[in-house]
Amino acid sequence: MPNHQASEQMLGYLYQVRYALALLLENDNSDCQISIEKFDDVAFSKDHIPIQLIQLKHHIQHQGNLADASTDMWRTIKVWLDAISETPDILDGTNFLIITTATAPIDSAAFLLKKDSNRNPDTAYEKLKTVCFSSVNQAHQRYYDAFREAGEDTVKQLIRQIYIIDCASNIIDVEKDILKHIRYSCIPKHQKMIYERLEGWWFKKAIDALCCDMPVFVNQNQVRSFIVSVSQEYVDDNLPIDILDIDDLQEDNFSANEKIFHEQLKLICLGNHRMQLALRDYYRAFRQRASWVRNDLL
């Protein structure tokens, strides 16, 4: 039986990385820096100081909930209150965002924290305070304890700086959002290939950052430079080189043509190291040509 909860968690992690790329491309400040899982799910920083902390909520199997007593809402508030407890200065000039695929119910605290004409942080605070002091949900008690212990002034200041972005693109649709930023860099038939290379590069950046103890920042100019560089490979008088490396070759896995080439190399008495290099180049060339044919570039 498939574990839908595990699948949804995995999608949530992938969504976090993909949506971070979309956020970076959409940002009006080309010098902005973004980090993943350092200050928060995603964070924008200036001079290595967070100016926007972002929690991402993705729901597929189960419809998300942003009601006043929802887990998504209260768990996030506790995360931010814990961060404020450790670094009180974080409240100075930092915005806190919840970006979710769910919909904020009308007149809920989340609805009143959207960036529109209905925004009313004071009323949102009162709604959350009512839940905090009246709820008997034992699973949420640690969230309510953090709310009460932080003090009214701190919680009110936090809530004034919270912004809810609901009905966000899901993990499939956010790909379309990213493609909108690529389409002006190339002709339409190459958009998907450039997107795939961009996302491969981006996911590697994210993995490297997650494996590093120190915060790793990527700015918008780096991403745009990569898009421009890759797009220049997809022009009428050029064939892109996108097969950059292959795994170690095992003779048992060779195709018939590769075995013939291998035997030919033996006949000219190449050493093992040079033979491996020749086989790797041969295999890369074969895969590269197959890629060009598959993508209709020849």
State the predicted function of each range.
Residues M1-Q9, H58-L298:
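Acidic metal-coordinating catalytic centers involved in nucleic-acid phosphodiester chemistry
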Residues Q5, Q9-M10, L14-K78, D82:
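Catalytic centers of nucleases
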